Amino acid sequence: MKRRYAIGLVFLLVCVARSDASVTPRHVTPASMDKNTRELFQESMDLDAQLYDDNVKLVHRPGFRSTASRTGSYMVRESSWYALGLLLRDAPGDRQRAADILDAVLKQQYVTPGVKWYGTYRRTPEEPDPTGNPVMWRGYDPNWRHFIGTTLAMVLIEYPDRISPELAKRMYEAIDRAIDGEMKEGRLLPSYSNIALMYGFLWDFAAVHDKNTDWQKQSAAWTESVYGLFKKYDAFFEYNSPTYYGVDLYGLALWRDYGSTKRIQTIGTEMESILWKDIASYYNPRLRNVSGPYDRSYGMDQESYVSIVGVWMRTVLDAKIAPLPPIAASTDHVADVWFAPHLAILGTRIPPDAFEKMKKFEGDHQLHKQITEDRVATAWISRDVIFGGESTNKTKDVGTGSQFHPATVQWRTPSGEIGWVQLTQAPMIDATADEHGIKISATGTVRFRIHAKDLAQTKVSEKEWELPGLRIAVDDDAKNFSIEKADDAVDITYSGMTVMTLGINAAH
């Protein structure tokens, strides 16, 4: 009885608190942006305009002429991001183009109840409808519910006067389908950090708009579960990802700006601050990169691919020092720069001490971070080389094509470009880093990829990697060693091993 009373009291307090936390538009305009944010926003919009198809009312995939047969030539999610940017800019013709795009995006939502993909969207209009029992991510992407849904919510909060009532009604209905579909699919966990944060905001937004008390109660419990999991170690389960940390920051900014209660806003602000400090501790401004280890990574050099953390940092750093490459249609993962309108509206809130670390290297330091009960990340951040390792208590392996890289090294080569090493394949693994290098424990086959301009394959042997600007001494018990060329890199494989030490020394 006491427990029921306590739960009821918490819910009552949550509902009462909703009246204390008003959600108001930020009224951001290009003129009100600071220089760096405005430059980023303009680059994003210029690329959108370059790739927009006025007949289809969607943006083309960058490089679509070479990839269309494999992935489709249009991007539904990213088109919704362009629409938000158009409404923000509000130049002549922007409102109509945004309305056309939003109409086209909404037509790509799966609206048949009772299927697992209900409420999500086609990734491209060329994508066939799922049939039978499709494999998640291949047959459909459930996360488009949240990437697109949160964008629609931002439009409805910020620019209700710039769209028609009919379009607004359709957008609210689309958000409801997304929430209903996610609830019924039941696949999402609070540990799936970036999606869990977006879902928490979107669920709260829909609950308040619909005056749905069940959703209000459930969304409040969801946000608390995400926060509670984070606070165990002040870390997200998807740890240290230059792309998905950027989505985490987006979700947290939605909480702190648009959360319907002071509680949501407060815990969103708290987690956002902690996350920025964590990012800053791994960042080396001389190398313009966040060190590994990476739980999920699409690249190893933020000077050559677009990471969403890099997009965030570009809003407060000049182009010449931000961890972001020049923006062109050919830039790796360039579509993520289309996240810029969201960031421009929400604003970048980096704690002052963390911001200083992003501008000036403050000295060599060791990092040791508990992620979960089983997982610990370690890294050595020095002036000329950064490297990290993740110990998993032998609970995680690294499969072919994995985004998980539990051992990484980055440095600047004599050419001026970033060189890197990433562990790309391993059985259950533990890796730890300190100022001397990386120690690895894994029984079986371990593979690394090494990339560095002017790398000579003949200078890479089992016991020593003589790389441009870096020397790594290897102490291992492997039974076999092999090396092969892989595009602009080399793959090296140690088979039949149990332990290995990489002794890392920058060549001055």
List the model feature ranges, each with a label.
Residues 15-17, 393:
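N-terminal low-complexity, intrinsically disordered patches enriched in charged
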Residues 154, 169-355:
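Extracellular polysaccharide-recognition and catalytic grooves
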Residues 8-15:
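Bacterial N-terminal signal peptides
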Residues 19-21:
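Boundary at the C-terminal end of the N-terminal hydrophobic targeting segment
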Residues 23-147, 151-160, 166-183, 319-508:
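Ser/Thr/Asn(+Pro)-rich, low-complexity disordered segments
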Residues 91-92, 161, 212, 261:
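Alpha-helix boundary/capping and short turn/kink residues
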Residues 1-7:
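Bacterial N-terminal signal peptides that target proteins for export
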